[in-house]
């Protein structure tokens, strides 16, 4: 008789379709990305010096095609595997246990590092925004970060429904407000609206620039697939997870195309003007008419508030995805079993939550006491830490997307949908391969160190398979975590 302990379980299956969509949209943070990342796609802040330029919306559309291809693969796996491990289980199914374990280390390690960096940014954003708008500074940035960490710890403890409903409220408010603002800008532009942003000839560097815009544009969508981490807590994951993944890709595409168009058109199709506002183009557009914007003081303050809301949604989404994935890996003994401990009352992953919160606290201490770590010239240290962490996280996730695409060719070789999988995998490999290239091309120190550290984590994850005594994946050992249980 086997003495192997039973597989640990998460809480009840209580999530609805809006909940799992909220996880993907919340993690992705379309308003946060629209506020700060669009200039990267345009090319005015990219390491390569290239981007889509005036044709940046076209770059986003092409990137979205690649994301839909990735979404098709994720959806295909999600119909078969209903485990909280998501991409870790998908890569395991396609490329074997060792590579799957390494991918899990990289994927969830990337999300944790991204979350830690983002929490530092939220603290700095709160302190600097309150200081600039109201000329007071009630708390230093580290204190704001600590408060947000504590808030997220409470949300994680009380269960997944609290987490997803928090994301839904924060993301929905921010999307509605910013969408109304974008429509207002388009209306005010009047006859200045143009189809130029959708014409390849508008790109200063031609198709080369558009290509680089696509590479950076893919990063806008990172995290769109994380609804899959909630499969175990969803009554009908075979139906709802694929819908959530593809719906999120669609929602994001519309928001990003409109946001990129408004950024380019709102600054009168001038890359110099976009570059001048590259630090926060959304807020520059929200400024008064005399300052070259389309709003005023109260509009700008409202935009600052909803961007904060979206940042909080991203932070919650990162922590929810990371805790579920780490729990799943610990349950399979791919990482220490203590990380699979759950709350008896709420069914939340206590061990994984404590680990993620602990890493965020360590990052806060590093930010405070090791001020030369990943430092950038004339840049607040919290922002430098975020820039490094987001580079690490974005690269980590894109590499795992790449591995998932390769594995899908094997996983679905005999499936009825194999033709569509082959097409999606080829498109996905091209898009993610390009994004990986963009993570290295002309990137300078210390940012260039991030992908190398990520590769090191991938190697460590692979090496761990020779040390840790893993067991059969729950996604294959437990009947309700496979397709047959929900048919």
State what each model feature region is.
Residues 6-11, 53-57, 133-142, 168-304, ...:
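Helix-loop-helix junctions that connect adjacent transmembrane segments
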Residues 29, 387-388, 392-400, 406, ...:
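A generic transmembrane alpha-helix motif of multi-pass inner-membrane proteins
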